[in-house]
């Protein structure tokens, strides 16, 4: 074996928090310590630093602190011991659920302005929110970068994948009795974008046609 008693394994992937306690329990008889670390920052983290949410004991956290300090952004924020083993991945799961909701809200706002005759340049409006607005954020900064090369975003396919964390958050929230309608709506929107609702909507359209004669024709769907 390559590991020795006293060594620490840090899981820095987007792993499910429910697996962390099991991993720690499997390693404990061998004297090997386990920590989980939620990591945020995407491809920009290599230059900006990564936000790190750690789960584990205080002692292990202090032992591994030099590693975390080397990866985090400069300054006082960007690194937190979220709780015991599992806490880091749980915090990152919630972080990603919030991210889903924020991106969905920006998308809905953009689409509403595109459909309106009153806003001539939705991309310019959203880009202007980067300074002084209560909705300014790094996500909006990234969107503004994309707007510079494609103000309509027509080059981007209207499909959004999901990696699982929002679903896990909704499941955890249900167990805890916490309502998460915004996160759920954002997750369902992504699933719908991949055609997951096609058969559902065919059933709905069929029933409308049967009970009320409401026939939906593709070429009659309003576009703008």
Language model features with spans:
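Helical "substrate-binding/catalytic lid" subdomain
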Residues: 49, 53, 63, 76-79, ...
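Acidic-glycine-rich active-site phosphate/pyrophosphate-binding loop
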Residues: 28-29, 33-35, 69-84
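Structural/interface elements that position substrates and couple domains in central-metabolism enzymes
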Residues: 15-18, 70, 74-77, 112
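Short phosphate-engaging motifs
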Residues: 16, 60, 105
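Rossmann-like NAD(P)(H) cofactor-binding subdomain of soluble oxidoreductases
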Residues: 1-51
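ATP-dependent carboxylate/acyl-activation modules
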Residues: 69-73, 209, 213-224
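Metal- and O2-centered redox machinery and metal/ROS homeostasis
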Residues: 21, 176-178, 218-224
């Amino acid at each position: 074996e390559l590991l020795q008693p006293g060594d620490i394994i840090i899981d820095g992937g987007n792993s499910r928090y429910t697996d962390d306690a099991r991993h720690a329990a499997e390693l404990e008889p061998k004297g090997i310590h386990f920590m989980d670390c939620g990591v945020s920052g995407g491809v920009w983290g290599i230059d900006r630093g990564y936000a790190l949410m750690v789960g584990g004991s205080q002692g292990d956290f202090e032992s591994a602190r030099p590693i975390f300090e080397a990866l985090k952004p400069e300054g006082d924020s960007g690194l937190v011991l979220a709780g015991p083993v599992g806490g880091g991945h749980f915090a990152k799961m919630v972080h990603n659920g919030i991210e889903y909701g924020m991106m969905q809200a920006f998308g809905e706002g953009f689409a509403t302005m595109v459909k309106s005759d009153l806003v001539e340049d939705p991309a310019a409006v959203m880009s202007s929110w980067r300074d002084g607005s209560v909705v300014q954020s790094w996500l909006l900064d990234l969107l503004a970068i994309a707007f510079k090369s494609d103000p309509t975003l027509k080059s981007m396919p209207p499909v959004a994948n999901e990696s699982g964390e929002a679903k896990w958050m909704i499941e955890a929230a249900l167990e805890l009795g916490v309502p998460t309608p915004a996160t759920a709506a954002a997750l369902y929107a992504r699933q719908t974008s991949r055609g997951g609702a096609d058969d559902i909507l065919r059933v709905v359209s069929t029933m409308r046609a049967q009970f009320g004669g409401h026939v939906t024709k593709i070429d009659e769907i309003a576009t703008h």
